[in-house]
């Protein structure tokens, strides 16, 4: 049957991803394909390729060339979708052609034809391997095998049930026989029932507490539900806020679209302006070419003029040299003439000195007039130079005016450039806002996709919850069946519990499997979510890249426009430099012409003045020569300046060439940018179309959102209902678990009762044997020395010794007397049947029966006593209340090597009603030898102690019992310890002893009490007992044979038996009693009310006037070579 389930699951898994692919890749195309599948395959083959064929033929060749890459991708996606649809139609047709019988044989179950055809279609699409054999054969063979195995297991179970029923019938017969023989012991079961009722009450209280805790949990869950509802309302409000934001964003988008349209119009205007600017640039280029040609012509002229000037300068230099030679000759002549003039003047001075007195004023006026004439000539020369300076100043003023005009034009251009930059910044801001709106739209899309994914997850969780509910219903039905069987078989069958445990294990395994499946599904969902997030991140990165490319293009455009403006400015500056150079060249030409005119005038004057030169002419010529030399130096400086200007012109030509190259590159860039602008415009048009489609898509998404919100509301309600059902199922499971726990506890108790019954049967046989031996022994001992007759005692003290935990002896000093009496669920009982005879001496003989069967429960029941021991011990001391009427027992622990006998000597003192006890080891040479004496009081006040005088190196250890701790013992007790108390008080538990147990300590226990009536024994108040019973338990090695010895000293009878049981009778000759022994439950009053009845066989008899004491020493064998411990316990018994 597993093959069918696996096939169906596999087919479902195969089908599911193909549908998801179709939904994710092609949304509206799947609807078309479904309609075509409904009609006929032939129509789908004919209709689908028609629009494809019409598209390329409808347009011209230019349209086919204009198709962009996105259009081609779109067409390819359409082609792929149509091919997938064709494949699906082929698969459907193949699946329809298959025979039903073959499909049923393949998949192994009978279902409607459509389901099988769908599975076959998925198999064709997945290209799975075809089947080879019929699936019906293997499951039938496996079913036959399973049926045979079930039959065999059924037979085995029936055999086990028959064996169990037979054993149960035998036990019932044995129990009925034992009930007939021992009706007295059945009375004690009432106490056990009372304890069980108490346990039931306690369990009921626990159930009430659990119910309260469950109610609190339900309240907490209700609070959680309310918080979840509040969160749902918040989410709904958040969804409404999202819708409002979407509407607001759509309004912003419309505004942004308007802005984009305005920007496009502005861009068109700028394009027209750019075209005009390009035309102007072309005109300027033509002007620049013209200017270049003019510059070339002017440079050629300048070079020619320069050559002529250089030739003239060389001629002038030669003339100047000749003139200088002439001047040198003239200067020599002038020197000679001056010397002659000096001599003449000296002579004339002598003559004139005489004439000065007559004609002083006339001669002085003539010299002054000559000097005035010379000064006038110099002024005229200076005026000619001033006119030249005035002309230069006028030219400078013209240049300054031109510069001011050009600066004004440059300022206007700068203002226009700033306006253009402001417009570009505004356009960039608008584009940034548009990009932000795009990003917000993408985020909204992502949010919608996330909400889709959440709805899908919720639907998947609903499906998983439904599957869980089905499984829980199946579990509930099975659990109801198990409850019914449990109620029927709680008291009868033990084997069915194993079956129930197995079923529970299988159910837990199934639940684990389902949880694992859910975890796997959740992991797959997380993987798919991660994939979706990665895809969305990739889309976001692509959009960011597109935006970055756009911004880069815009920055390039901006940089290109800046560079163009800079080039324009540079061209204007260079034009200004050219104009300056032209003006300088004109100035130089004018200067050269003026120099040539001056030279001509100079030559003419020279020729005219050659004939008659005077001293004054010579001076004038000298001055002219000086001026000419100065002008020549000035011309040289001007030539140097012209050379520098020529160098500058060459540099400007190089720069012009580089600028031309840059201009060509910028033209290419501008063409490339224009192409990119056209591409961007195309993308903007496409984007507008996409926005139009997105608005319709957003409306559709909004509708889908509303539908999904309604679905999520329904899903949340269903989830709440499912949660309530799950809580109910959990409550039923808890109740079933409690019932199973109670069933296991009751089964354990039944096992314990059966073990007790077996032990009882064995113990009864042992008791009958011991009774016969005791009667025989008492008959042999009846004639005593004093003429008294020993009564037949019926003291049978059963003393149980537990297996020590971790092979260590238990510390009996810390145990309470009741705990000593009830160790490992067994009761130590002591019963005496004493016959009164005033003529015989009172010596009591008591046997101790230590044979028992091993019980495995003893080990389990030892643990609570250990726990109680830890709770009661504090520093080895136990405190008592001062008002208690009981003696605090003092314990003495004596070490003794096993396998060696002990010598005990008892000397009674009837005057003081005491007896001294001496316990000695016979070998004083060994290191473990010792002697100890104890004084045991027979009667007196109720508060008495046993004093032990030690003769060896043995320290007495005292411990005090605490009534307060014992009062608190019942509060800290577990139900197991209470069950052990109850079982310990029943007569069936009187001797389950393991023969291979370890050594037990010898205890000294002193308890006082008096029993005047049975009512007092049953009353909760402490009963004072007027006699003492000292019990010595010694643990040497095991001895199998019986030895009868008797030693009498000072009217005391000491009897040793075969298994080293020494019975010492201490009593006054006037007092003897016949009563059943009392073993008090504890030295505290509150614990005695319920347990004295279980410890006393019947009512307490009324006391007589005789008081006796008996000391019983019981040896128990130890297989391990350990030292034994001796503890003395005196017990007060009523007589």
UniProtKB/Swiss-Prot annotation:
Q: Extract one GO BP annotation from the record.
A: protein localization to actin cytoskeleton
Please list where the region (Disordered) is annotated.
1-65
Question: Does the record's keyword annotation contain Coiled coil?
Answer: yes
What switches on its expression? Up-regulated in endothelial cells with the angiogenesis inhibitors endostatin and fumagillin. By endothelial monocyte-activating polypeptide II in endothelial cells.
Looking up Pfam families in the UniProt record yields: CortBP2
State the family named in the UniProt similarity comment for this chain. Belongs to the FILIP1 family.
Coiled coil, from the record:
164-782
Residues modified as Phosphoserine are 791, 1052
Basic and acidic residues biased stretches: 52-65
The modified positions for Phosphothreonine read 986, 994
Expression across tissues is: Expressed in endothelial cells, colon and colon cancers. In the colon, expressed in the vasculature and muscularis mucosa. In colon cancer, strongly expressed in tumor stroma and the vasculature (at protein level). Expressed in ovarian epithelial cells. Down-regulated in ovarian cancer.
Q: Which UniProt keywords apply?
A: Coiled coil, Cytoplasm, Membrane, Nucleus, Phosphoprotein
Primary localization: cytoplasm
Question: Function, please?
Answer: Acts as a regulator of the antiangiogenic activity on endothelial cells. When overexpressed in endothelial cells, leads to inhibition of cell proliferation and migration and an increase in apoptosis. Inhibits melanoma growth When expressed in tumor-associated vasculature.
Q: Which InterPro entries match?
A: Cortactin-Actin_Reg (IPR050719), Cortactin-binding_p2_N (IPR019131)
Q: What is this protein called?
A: Filamin A-interacting protein 1-like
Annotated compartments = Cytoplasm; Membrane; Nucleus
Q: Name one GO cellular component term.
A: cytoplasm
